[in-house]
């Protein structure tokens, strides 16, 4: 099993291209199942979750072509199966996103209950109750969600909780429903706006994406299209925090500052100089970061996917901070690993108090989920000595060649296959 070895190595400096957003690419890949013609998606990151999704589409019968220019073409016409098997679904929660498209396009779907990061229950009830409101018959048996409907019928759906994947699933299903669907209490994330753009390019009629009320006028069929997914705002934020922690000066290209305003505000509060351009963000940190309080909430508030990274920064910041997680339970699993590096953190329920220390010290640590693993990488960049991070397959699910990108900025980081290669 691969590991990452880091040695604290001073400020990060240089330029970096940001990858396409995994959380935009995954629903767009699922949306290709709705079409009657091939769909081409561009700016797709090379990640484990993307590979798993492509395997799932192929298992369903779709023809998948991958080129060397971050492009993927999916031809859904040969799809012959509506069963998403456990072997693929168990590793990735986003696989539930094929439920709506398969049901809407083929009249039935069987999707194994999903797996993924162990950061809370993330119930699929929002997906199921919404599809039932659209006229689907749904049962859950033998670990599978089984759904059937001759044709879905548009209706008004008030979502019981704000759910990104729930909004995406219902949005996709409603594009082929008969009549108008209104989604209320919908999630507002940029990745949902991007999915709506993709669906609209395929012929869907959607308004209100990016607000809490989305209206979809169902159409008889969707055609082929080409769509480029948005930049990854979480990858962007992660590298910005890395620069802030190391006292660096980096410029990120092919990104969008408008997608992470709450993160940029917190970085400025921490003392960073942030300059934005049309598709660039430059950050310079000339001092030890100031501790900043963080409270996660649905977009446009501070994202839960940046909580662990800011906790890592607060570990070496000047002063004390309070980090509050309101989205998921069990999302402080990185705390004990940061403590192994010398962090002063007291976590209780959904709140953690972080007291900044002068320095962290390297140690063996273990990643528990995607963003927790990112926080350990950030901590390793500033820790004295060597930090060895185990179970980095979590990291590979969401960050494209992170060791190569950080190395290009001057970090001392490398991937190793086993600890025996470290002397």
From Swiss-Prot:
Active site: 117 (proton donor)
Enzyme class label: transferase
One Pfam family this sequence matches: EPSP_synthase
Reaction(s) the record says it catalyses: phosphoenolpyruvate + UDP-N-acetyl-alpha-D-glucosamine = UDP-N-acetyl-3-O-(1-carboxyvinyl)-alpha-D-glucosamine + phosphate
GO terms for MF: UDP-N-acetylglucosamine 1-carboxyvinyltransferase activity
Biological process terms in GO annotation: cell division; cell wall organization; peptidoglycan biosynthetic process; regulation of cell shape; UDP-N-acetylgalactosamine biosynthetic process
Binding residue positions for UDP-N-acetyl-alpha-D-glucosamine: 93, 305, 327
2-(S-cysteinyl)pyruvic acid O-phosphothioketal, modified sites: 117
InterPro entries cross-referenced by the UniProt entry: Enolpyruvate_Tfrase_dom, Enolpyruvate_Tfrase_sf, MurA_subfamily, RNA3'P_cycl/enolpyr_Trfase_a/b, UDP_GlcNAc_COvinyl_MurA
Keywords, comma-separated and alphabetical: Cell cycle, Cell division, Cell shape, Cell wall biogenesis/degradation, Cytoplasm, Peptidoglycan synthesis, Pyruvate, Transferase
Binding residues for phosphoenolpyruvate: 22-23
Pathway in which the depicted protein is active: Cell wall biogenesis; peptidoglycan biosynthesis
Name this polypeptide is given: UDP-N-acetylglucosamine 1-carboxyvinyltransferase
Species this chain originates from: Acidithiobacillus ferrooxidans (strain ATCC 23270 / DSM 14882 / CIP 104768 / NCIMB 8455)
Taxonomic classification: Bacteria, Pseudomonadati, Pseudomonadota, Acidithiobacillia, Acidithiobacillales
């Amino acid at each position: 099993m691969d590991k990452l070895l880091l040695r604290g190595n001073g400020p990060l400096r240089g330029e970096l291209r940001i990858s396409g957003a995994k959380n935009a690419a995954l629903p767009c890949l699922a949306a290709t199942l709705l079409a009657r013609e091939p769909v081409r998606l561009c700016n797709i990151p090379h990640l484990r979750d993307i590979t798993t999704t492509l395997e799932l589409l192929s298992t369903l019968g779709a023809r998948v072509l991958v080129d060397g220019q971050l492009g993927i073409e999916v031809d859904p016409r040969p799809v012959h199966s509506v069963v998403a098997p456990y072997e693929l679904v168990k590793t990735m929660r986003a696989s539930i996103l094929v439920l709506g498209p398969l049901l809407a396009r083929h009249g039935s779907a069987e999707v194994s209950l999903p797996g993924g990061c162990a950061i809370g229950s993330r119930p699929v009830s929002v997906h199921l109750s919404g599809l039932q409101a659209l006229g689907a018959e749904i049962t859950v048996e033998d670990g599978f969600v089984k759904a059937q409907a001759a044709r879905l019928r548009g209706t008004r759906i008030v979502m019981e909780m704000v759910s990104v994947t729930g909004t995406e699933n219902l949005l996709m299903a409603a594009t082929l429903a008969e009549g108008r669907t209104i989604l209320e209490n919908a999630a507002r994330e940029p990745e949902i706006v991007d999915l709506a753009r993709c669906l609209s390019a395929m012929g869907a009629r959607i308004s209100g994406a990016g607000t809490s009320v989305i209206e979809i006028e169902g159409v008889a069929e969707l055609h082929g299209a080409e769509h480029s997914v948005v930049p990854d705002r979480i990858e962007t934020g992660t590298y910005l925090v890395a620069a802030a922690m190391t006292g660096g000066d980096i410029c990120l290209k092919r990104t969008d500052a408008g997608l992470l305003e709450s993160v940029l505000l917190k970085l400025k509060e921490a003392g960073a100089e942030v300059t934005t351009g049309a598709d660039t963000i430059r950050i310079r940190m000339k001092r030890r970061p100031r501790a900043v309080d963080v409270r996660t909430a649905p977009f446009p508030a501070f994202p839960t996917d940046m909580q662990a990274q800011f906790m890592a920064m607060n570990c070496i910041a000047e002063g004390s901070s309070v980090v509050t997680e309101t989205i998921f339970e069990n999302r402080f699993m990185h705390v004990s690993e940061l403590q192994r590096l010398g962090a002063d953190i007291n976590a209780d329920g959904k709140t953690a108090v972080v007291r900044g220390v002068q320095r962290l010290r390297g140690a063996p640590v273990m990643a528990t989920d995607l963003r927790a693993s990112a926080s350990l990488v950030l901590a390793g960049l500033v820790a004295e000595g060597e930090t060895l991070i185990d179970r980095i397959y979590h990291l590979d699910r969401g960050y494209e060649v992170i060791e190569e990108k950080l190395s290009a900025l001057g970090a001392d980081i490398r991937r190793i296959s086993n600890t025996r290669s470290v002397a």
